[in-house]
Amino acid sequence: MSGELPPNINIKEPRWDQSTFIGRANHFFTVTDPRNILLTNEQLESARKIVHDYRQGIVPPGLTENELWRAKYIYDSAFHPDTGEKMILIGRMSAQVPMNMTITGCMMTFYRTTPAVLFWQWINQSFNAVVNYTNRSGDAPLTVNELGTAYVSATTGAVATALGLNALTKHVSPLIGRFVPFAAVAAANCINIPLMRQRELKVGIPVTDENGNRLGESANAAKQAITQVVVSRILMAAPGMAIPPFIMNTLEKKAFLKRFPWMSAPIQVGLVGFCLVFATPLCCALFPQKSSMSVTSLEAELQAKIQESHPELRRVYFNKGL
């Protein structure tokens, strides 16, 4: 290997310490960088070659550590971690901010009529379905039935919440009405994510010791993982759906937007995008990707199995998902 690059860099793990919030935030700011969706196929293939070659002990002359890490994050942003296949463009983490800012901005601009609510909630849940399918587990892929059930249920839940709250808020302040899309998105997340991961709730997710040695499967760990993901997804949407309504409520009373009402949607999308650039990585970083729980919180059968084989073990670890 080249003398410029140490041979033992672990590019299977993130570059920053994942036991700290700052380390996780740095990691997700890199993973969700929207500029990655602008990369050409040639740049993606170059990054894939660098990563694959390095894992085989082959390093191009002059490759630096920073260039290796850049290639690793480009590779991770575009290729599925289990299958190695190139992911659908809009399903990649780097597409989250531009896609969500557009959809959320439009949901919050066109929320007053039933057809608009139906259309934008359907668009939002269709996008969520693409993201969930793109980032599915390679070991336990989603079936068409599971994907369809989650998609239909989340769309129905979001639309019902939005239409119900629209009816309730007709006689209150217009500002309150602007928060209806956020309530619909929160309700949809509470439906969509557990349904999308229903197999994990039934059979459990793999739990390991600190060194990654597999100890069994736990549905209790799956419940904790899914709860953390639901919380982070709702909080991720909160700034972009809670701050712009106050700003737009003030702006729409000004002469500028009264004269140019068509500017409302672009301004709303821009405000949402600004919030999401920070909220997306920071909320992904709220909980460690490698989450943990006490052995005593596991199912009795798994507890007994672990206590028999690893009597000194106090905590188990698992991948919480995104």
UniProtKB/Swiss-Prot annotation:
Positions in the Mitochondrial matrix compartment: 2-102, 168-174, 250-266
Keywords for this protein: Acetylation, Amino-acid transport, Membrane, Mitochondrion, Mitochondrion inner membrane, One-carbon metabolism, Transmembrane, Transmembrane helix, Transport
Residues the record lists as N-acetylserine modifications: S2
Membrane topology (Mitochondrial intermembrane): 121-146, 196-228, 288-322
Known tissue expression: Highly expressed in tissues with high one-carbon metabolism activity, such as blood, liver and kidney.
Gene Ontology MF terms in the entry: L-alanine transmembrane transporter activity; L-serine transmembrane transporter activity; monoatomic ion transmembrane transporter activity; transmembrane transporter activity
GO biological process, one term: L-serine transport
Cellular compartment(s): Mitochondrion inner membrane
Membrane-traversing stretches: 103-120, 147-167, 175-195, 229-249, 267-287
Swiss-Prot/TrEMBL catalytic activity: L-serine(in) = L-serine(out); L-alanine(in) = L-alanine(out); L-cysteine(in) = L-cysteine(out)
Any GO CC annotation of this UniProt entry: mitochondrial inner membrane
Membrane topology: Multi-pass membrane protein
Role this protein plays: Amino acid transporter importing serine, an essential substrate of the mitochondrial branch of the one-carbon pathway, into mitochondria. Mitochondrial serine is then converted to glycine and formate, which exits to the cytosol where it is used to generate the charged folates that serve as one-carbon donors. May also transport other amino acids including alanine and cysteine.
Similarity field: Belongs to the sideroflexin family.
Protein name per the record: Sideroflexin-1
Organism ancestry: Eukaryota, Metazoa, Chordata, Craniata, Vertebrata
